[in-house]
Amino acid sequence: MKEKILILNGSFCEIPLIEEAQRLGYYVVTTGNAPDLIGHKYADEYIPADYSNGEAILSLVKENDIRHVISCANDFGVLTAAYVSEKLGLPGHDSFEVAKTLHLKDLFKEYTAKHGIPAPISTVFVNEEDAKEYIKTAKYPIIVKATDLTGGKGILKAENEKEAIYAIENAFSASRSKHIVIEPFITGVQQTFVSFLQNKKVVSYTGCNSYSPINPYLIQAETLPAEGLDEIARPLIAIIENIAEELSLADGVFAFQLIRNGKDFHIIEMMRRPFGNQFLQLVEDNTDFPWHTAQLYAQLGLDGSALPRIPKKRPFCGHHGIMAPRNGTVKHYEIPKEIEKHIYEKVEINPPGSEITNCMNERIAYIFYEYESLEEMNEAVKTFNERITVEMA
């Protein structure tokens, strides 16, 4: 009989993990409170539950003879997987305290400040009045963030006190824990540096440029590898390996989002999980490392150090989320032939006929593309929103 594993969520982001786990011989159960997500159709079984609720998932695991918990492309999934695994003595995850330190923005910024890691200096607030008093003397622009959300939720930039008041109210309203951080707004090029840890050492890495032309707090497109990757790889690897040693991190993905100014950088977020938008598939195509298999091995508590390297498929690749210009019903979208010829995969999330209720966050489709050079790709991607037409009813 196959061992049961639980993957926390079943969006299209989790499909590669679901398929790889099945290939490895596991019976895959997915969960989450959105039963219509496409990933659930790929699983062997779907059991509804709120994957951000640690106690609910703990009960689900106990009641269904599940042997391992796999985190999803969301920070709440990382926290729940760590919590449940710690309670049941399951391998493959950081301790719950470490997971909170790394994935809650206020705790992570305290950690970076304590250890001299280059990051914006953050001030943490647990009530609105203190935050609103602070902004009276703040140096603008600032950025206000809920500490426990992802995907650009609960984040706003403020140029003045009036905007800051609105940003504070927005962040507190969005945050589950009612914790927010306020920090200086750092300008520069946004990039992601993604690495894989085995025995607390980085064994593979790459990076990407990140583009957010529609919603400045939501990445819409990414191109791999990052421009100037070699200039920042060594210091970032040193930071990651130092954190891994000090916090005794489990094997698996470790990534930073950062703002670059030449060789200087500020770390703004970190993640120990697969990203949304099937980003790990791009990373796998752009390197010679089997990221999905290795991530599953890590969270199953298996030794992945002997996993064979794979051919590097796509030296210059990326993805872009097609977004609607306004809310409404998607009638039609069209990708020009000049872009189409570079696309090797397209995934429709909200096809024609679908209703868009939040055009600043929802995607109509994801396109995955490759080019002959990094320069050509980066220039092309900047024009995608102008050239890809979307008709709404």
Segments predicted by a language model, with ranges:
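Short beta-strand-to-loop capping motifs
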Residues: 158-160, 195, 322-326, 367-373
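A conserved helix-loop-beta module that forms one wall/lid of the active-site cleft
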Residues: 86-154
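Active-site "cap" helix and flanking loop/linker of ATP-utilizing ligase/carboxylase catalytic domains
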Residues: 235-256, 261, 271-327
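Conserved short beta-strand edge segments in small beta-sheet-based binding/regulatory domains
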Residues: 182, 343-348, 389-393
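Glycine-rich active-site loop/lid that clamps phosphate-bearing ligands
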Residues: 322-352
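Internal nucleotide-binding/catalytic subdomain
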Residues: 155-265
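Short, well-ordered beta-strand elements within core beta-sheets of diverse protein domains
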Residues: 184, 228, 364-372
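ATP-binding N-terminal substructure of ATP-dependent carboxylate-amine bond-forming enzymes
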Residues: 1-97, 129, 302, 324, ...
